[in-house]
Regions:
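Vicinal oxygen chelate
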Residues: 1, 10, 34, 42-45, ...
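Flexible, glycine-rich phosphate/dinucleotide-binding loops
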Residues: 37-40, 52, 64-65, 130-133
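Helix-adjacent hinge/juxtasegments
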Residues: 60-63, 67-76
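Eukaryotic phosphotyrosine signaling hubs
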Residues: 5-7, 75-79
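Short, charged/polar surface micro-motifs in flexible loops or helix N-caps
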Residues: 49-54, 62-65, 87-88
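Pocket-edge structural micro-motifs
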Residues: 48, 60, 128
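Core segments of cupin and vicinal oxygen chelate
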Residues: 2, 9-54
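Helix N-cap motif at beta-to-alpha junctions
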Residues: 15, 85-88
């Protein structure tokens, strides 16, 4: 049996501001932006450049009970992990584009990592795993 996680839903305040952030600040590719009239919503999917794995489904908070979770889907913990093949290239580009890093780069036993916030305050790891890390054989 072969299975995979296709999308991770990220609750956002507004489709267009989220698309702008992810495509302009993080260089993600807009995979799909389809209006679904029967549900009066959009199906918006983005992914890191060159990625063939899991994508982000940008899901607008449309109900009152969803709105408090914009920017806090993981209770203040790091929510998503953006793996890169060149940490310093991506870190420097992100800083130049105004991405807010809340934890500075650090060399750990598993690789190089820094924590940044997206436009809503969700925490992300930017990381480059060591070549011998078990995930590095699967990632990228």
């Amino acid at each position: 049996m072969k299975q995979s996680i296709v999308h991770i839903a990220l609750v956002v305040r507004d489709y267009d501001e989220a698309i702008e952030f992810y495509t302009k600040k993080l260089n993600f590719t807009l995979i799909e932006d389809t209006y679904q009239a029967e549900q009066d919503k959009r199906w918006v999917v983005v992914a890191p450049p060159g990625s063939i794995g899991t994508t982000l489904l940008l899901a607008r908070a449309s109900k009152a009970e969803q709105k408090p979770f914009v920017g806090n889907q993981s209770g203040g913990r790091v929510f998503l992990f953006l793996n890169t093949d060149d940490f310093w290239r991506d870190y420097n580009e992100m800083v130049a584009k105004g991405i807010m890093f809340v934890r500075e780069p650090k060399k750990e036993i598993y690789g190089t990592v820094a924590v940044f916030e997206d436009l809503y305050g969700n925490l992300w790891d930017l990381l480059e795993l060591n070549d011998d890390h078990p995930i590095s054989r699967r990632a990228l």
